[in-house]
């Protein structure tokens, strides 16, 4: 997506450990117009897919996920980085490495919010 590449080249900064810092437009301060363009691009690329949810991880991914979900008219589900008292019942868990935080998280999503066949093409 050229608009995102251009924005990264313009405002992104490379930090130690090859970390790309994009906090001025993606994950601390959010450029909603840019998010809208990203949402349009996801809709274009997955127009033939039967999308029923947008899944992301808590924190940085939520903003973009919400805009993308508007284009598909579907809910957003986000994986939590910590078990909380209000997540009851069966859950999906996996480990995810955060390069920016330098640690591994055990992320959690309640099974009730995910269904079978997360991705399949429309016929």
Language model features with spans:
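Short, flexible loop segments at the rims of nucleotide/cofactor-binding pockets, characterized by
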Residues: 30-34, 55, 97-102
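A glycine-rich, hydrophobic loop/mini-helix early in the fold
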Residues: 42, 55, 72, 78
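Short glycine-rich phosphate-binding loop at a beta-alpha junction
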Residues: 51-58
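Structural motif
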Residues: 55, 121-122
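Short Gly/Thr/Asp-enriched flexible loops that form oxyanion-binding sites at enzyme active sites
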Residues: 63-72
């Amino acid at each position: 997506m050229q608009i995102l590449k251009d924005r990264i080249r313009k405002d992104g900064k490379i930090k130690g450990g090859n970390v790309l810092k994009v906090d001025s437009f993606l994950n601390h301060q959010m450029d909603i117009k840019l998010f809208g363009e990203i949402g349009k691009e996801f809709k274009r690329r997955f127009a033939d897919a039967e999308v029923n949810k947008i899944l992301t991880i808590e924190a940085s991914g939520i903003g973009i996920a919400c805009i993308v979900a508007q284009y598909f008219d579907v809910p957003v589900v986000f994986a939590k980085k910590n078990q909380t008292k209000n997540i009851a019942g069966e859950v999906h868990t996996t480990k995810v490495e955060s390069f920016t935080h330098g640690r591994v998280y055990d992320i959690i999503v309640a099974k009730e919010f995910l269904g079978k066949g997360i991705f399949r093409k429309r016929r």
